[in-house]
Amino acid sequence: MSRISIEEVKHVAHLARLAITEEEAKMFTEQLDSIISFAEELNEVNTDNVEPTTHVLKMKNVMREDEAGKGLPVEDVMKNAPDHKDGYIRVPSILD
């Protein structure tokens, strides 16, 4: 039995604003079902003696202090913006 339906794949594609064909929807359904099946297999792994970790490697990020620096003058920034108004950069609308 499939763990994900073709309708669910089409719905997620629609939410992501992706146009997919019927053939692609079937292919993605099979691929996602395989991924979900593998993830379910991981639930069967005995991890009783495994210490919980937050990262795969024991590396830590060394961060610098987050200090605000001097920015560019607005006029210089607007020179690089293709469309601007009243000190704001205008971009095309992406939401319906």
Curated annotation (Swiss-Prot):
Subunit structure: Heterotrimer of A, B and C subunits.
Listed GO biological process terms: glutaminyl-tRNAGln biosynthesis via transamidation; regulation of translational fidelity; translation
EC numbers: 6.3.5.-
Top-level EC class: ligase
Alphabetic keyword roster: ATP-binding, Ligase, Nucleotide-binding, Protein biosynthesis
Organism: Bacillus subtilis (strain 168)
GO molecular function, one term: ATP binding
Catalyzed reactions: L-glutamyl-tRNA(Gln) + L-glutamine + ATP + H2O = L-glutaminyl-tRNA(Gln) + L-glutamate + ADP + phosphate + H(+); L-aspartyl-tRNA(Asn) + L-glutamine + ATP + H2O = L-asparaginyl-tRNA(Asn) + L-glutamate + ADP + phosphate + 2 H(+)
Protein name, UniProt field: Glutamyl-tRNA(Gln) amidotransferase subunit C
Taxonomic lineage: Bacteria, Bacillati, Bacillota, Bacilli, Bacillales
Free-text function comment from the UniProt entry: Allows the formation of correctly charged Asn-tRNA(Asn) or Gln-tRNA(Gln) through the transamidation of misacylated Asp-tRNA(Asn) or Glu-tRNA(Gln) in organisms which lack either or both of asparaginyl-tRNA or glutaminyl-tRNA synthetases. The reaction takes place in the presence of glutamine and ATP through an activated phospho-Asp-tRNA(Asn) or phospho-Glu-tRNA(Gln).
Designated gene of the protein: gatC
Gene3D superfamilies assigned: Glu-tRNAGln amidotransferase C subunit, N-terminal domain (1.10.20.60)
Family note: Belongs to the GatC family.
SUPFAM superfamilies assigned to the protein according to its UniProt record, in alphabetical order: Glu-tRNAGln amidotransferase C subunit
